[in-house]
Amino acid sequence: MQVTVNEHDAVECVATATPAGNREAHAHGTDKLAIEGGRRLAGEIAVSGAKNAALPILCAGLLSAEPVRLDNVPDLKDVRTTLALLGQMGMREETDGARVVLDASRVDNPVAPYELVKTMRASILVLGPLLARFGYAKVSLPGGCAIGARPVDQHIKGLQAMGAEIHIEHGYIEARAKRLSGARIVTDMITVTGTENLLMAATLADGETVIENAAREPEVTDLAHLLVAMGAKIDGIGTDRLVIQGVERLHGATHAVIPDRIEAGTFLCAVAAAGGDVTLTGMRAHILDAVIDKLREAGATIDEGVDTLRVRMDGRPSAVAIRTSEYPAFPTDMQAQFMALNAVAQGAAQVTETIFENRFMHVQELNRLGANIAVDGNTALVTGVPKLSGASVMATDLRASASLVIAGLCAQGETLVERIYHLDRGYDRMETKLTAVGANVRRISGSEA
């Protein structure tokens, strides 16, 4: 049986459940953003912790009975949903701003129900930790998703190679194992969440596990660093071959989540498109090399500090060709934002999407703003125009919504971006951060609309 799970933006699906946890859910399902374009951006923006690192790291808290202390955790809807899911299992958590303390000593319900999994595909990441520590896990299959999918088969195949008995019935993956055994696992494709799930499971397995064709994303590396801090034995971190020596137990640890390279890239792209001079703080340039290279090609000046990135842009950008691929190549999660940049650039450029089969849904909305984009299969030809014009547009997924915000910053007149609950899944207070550097962006709550 083949089932599917989104790999890179593991949580792009529509949220319908009310997130729990101590963090306040500040977004309403019908909120909109009103953007008055044409302003240069200037000032500083603090980059939040990485969503795609925080979610597996929160799930890794299940691997130990001792407290795991996390810093730089972003305040996002998906983080709150993950904490709600872990809380249902018996995990206790304390949250103070960007600091979260997890205590899994009393976890007694190793089940991830459909009600939460359908809102967030990253919920599959509890499968490996639950099975490794408790010998049992029951996790709902992820539901439908807007932008295409990748198979969860790789997770199941890898766990079966480690000795797990897995049955899929009534929409649930039910997995059992007295203790997982080390194995050599070769994934059919590069899978981020699959690598993370198998890596977490292998830390408590009996013997050596080798994961070949492992994902190399910085978020996978960040998870591995937390696991090592908890007592795991992992070699090959940052490469496509991970070697894990299983241990009897993992202990507590303290860890800071890496900066969000996609949030940083989105703001860099916004400045390159709209013009300005902005410094990003709390950012590591080396995890964003492919994006920085393309922005320089577009004409932006980017200065790299120890933990800062300064971007300066005058005039129109130059069109740049993009081809998405696995890290360290150009990330699929930045494709839509560069589409918006190319929409106002001088010249024309091709954008080719190789990761997802259905990730051009923002094209129709960008064209509503006056962009000139033609799609042919997995390639889009973007011919830049001097100016976009404000209009009402609708977000279809997380990164598409970011591209519409960037386009709105460049457009003449007002742009109204609807369904921004997508944006809130992956960006911590985007409108607040943009307003602080001179953008005219305001949230219209559902009650006002």
From Swiss-Prot:
Pathway membership: Cell wall biogenesis; peptidoglycan biosynthesis
Catalytic EC class: transferase
Keyword Cell wall biogenesis/degradation included in the entry's annotation: yes
Residues the record lists as 2-(S-cysteinyl)pyruvic acid O-phosphothioketal modifications: C145
Keyword Cytoplasm found: yes
GO cellular component terms attached to this protein's record: cytoplasm
CDD domains found in the cross-reference section: UdpNAET
Binding site residues for phosphoenolpyruvate: K51, N52
Localization: Cytoplasm
Keywords assigned by UniProt, alphabetized: Cell cycle, Cell division, Cell shape, Cell wall biogenesis/degradation, Cytoplasm, Peptidoglycan synthesis, Pyruvate, Transferase
Residues binding UDP-N-acetyl-alpha-D-glucosamine, per UniProt: R121, R150, P151, V152, D153, Q154, D333, I355
GO molecular function, one term: UDP-N-acetylglucosamine 1-carboxyvinyltransferase activity
Major location (coarse): cytoplasm
Catalytic reaction list: phosphoenolpyruvate + UDP-N-acetyl-alpha-D-glucosamine = UDP-N-acetyl-3-O-(1-carboxyvinyl)-alpha-D-glucosamine + phosphate
SUPFAM superfamilies on file: EPT/RTPC-like (SSF55205)
GO biological process, one term: peptidoglycan biosynthetic process
Active-site residue numbers: C145
HAMAP family xref list: MurA
The protein's role, per its UniProt record: Cell wall formation. Adds enolpyruvyl to UDP-N-acetylglucosamine.
Protein family per UniProt: Belongs to the EPSP synthase family. MurA subfamily.
Identification of the protein by name: UDP-N-acetylglucosamine 1-carboxyvinyltransferase
Source organism per UniProt: Burkholderia mallei (strain ATCC 23344)
